[in-house]
């Protein structure tokens, strides 16, 4: 049974989160949690939280056994960008894009 968890509008760029997502794709859930625990990136904390949510959803909603679960799919899409202004010298200003992303984790016992 497939179970999904999502984190929308995560405050990291999709490019940075994809680096972490590629580490755990296809792994067993216990191994994926270990990898994320020792990965020294801000995105690893966000992905770990979504993975733990997917595990809890599978256990509570579908009655799945945690030992059998695998990360079957994980993908990161771009979310909306917040536009901000950075003041510069001589009265000028630059536009800054604060990028967000949507993290989706699918776990399955097959």
Curated annotation (Swiss-Prot):
The keyword Nuclease does not apply. One of its GO terms (biological process) is translation. SUPFAM superfamilies: Ribosomal protein L22 (SSF54843). Keywords: Ribonucleoprotein, Ribosomal protein, RNA-binding, rRNA-binding. GO terms for molecular function: rRNA binding; structural constituent of ribosome. HAMAP family: Ribosomal_uL22_B. This protein binds specifically to 23S rRNA; its binding is stimulated by other ribosomal proteins, e.g. L4, L17, and L20. It is important during the early stages of 50S assembly. It makes multiple contacts with different domains of the 23S rRNA in the assembled 50S subunit and ribosome. Part of the 50S ribosomal subunit. Belongs to the universal ribosomal protein uL22 family. This is Large ribosomal subunit protein uL22. The gene is rplV.
